């Protein structure tokens, strides 16, 4: 059994404000796969404050910096692909083949799609004597379901990062 009892906030693994845990049950075996920390409103506030502070710098990052980040993310994802699939199998009880081919594959697919769009995206578009500028909006709050965990996270995180937003 593995325990994931910290949150990654402001570049560091931190303890939750209130130490409360939840068991993760593998629905295929009904075995406890691990425990996770449960967040509170205070934890969310800390994460939002950190994301807001990071927004000022990230929103001003260059296209080249964002492309480089996505290239590094994709390379790291490929290195950990088997681990991702194994975690999906364990935490949601998905058959290994489904976790490997569909679940883990969809996550990297969203990163690759965002990178492809980012390389050709026009953040500035002249229209006659006017310039339309598309800018990052701020901190994005991303709520994802459990049934396609990597897919639902990646399809929200990838575009947010690509356009210069931070997220919680």
Cite the ranges covered by each PLM segment.
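Conserved catalytic core of two-component sensor histidine kinases
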Residues: 45, 105, 154
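Long amphipathic alpha-helix in the N-terminal Rossmann-like dinucleotide-binding domain
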Residues: 71-82, 94-120
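Short linear capping/connector segments at secondary-structure termini
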Residues: 87-95, 102, 125-129
């Amino acid at each position: 059994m593995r325990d994931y009892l910290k949150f990654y906030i402001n570049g560091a693994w931190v303890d939750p404000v209130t130490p409360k845990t939840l068991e993760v049950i593998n629905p295929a075996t009904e075995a406890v796969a691990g425990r996770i920390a449960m967040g509170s409103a205070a934890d969310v506030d800390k994460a939002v404050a950190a994301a807001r502070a990071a927004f000022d710098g990230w929103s001003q990052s260059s296209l080249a910096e964002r492309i480089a980040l996505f290239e590094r993310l994709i390379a790291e994802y490929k290195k950990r692909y088997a681990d991702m699939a194994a975690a999906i199998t364990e935490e949601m009880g998905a058959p290994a083949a489904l976790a490997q081919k569909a679940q883990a594959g969809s996550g990297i697919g969203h990163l690759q799609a965002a990178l492809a769009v980012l390389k050709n995206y026009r953040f500035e578009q002249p229209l006659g004597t006017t310039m339309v500028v598309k800018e990052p909006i701020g901190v994005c709050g991303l709520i994802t379901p459990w049934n396609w965990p990597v897919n639902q996270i990646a399809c929200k995180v990838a575009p947010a990062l690509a356009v210069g937003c931070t997220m919680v």
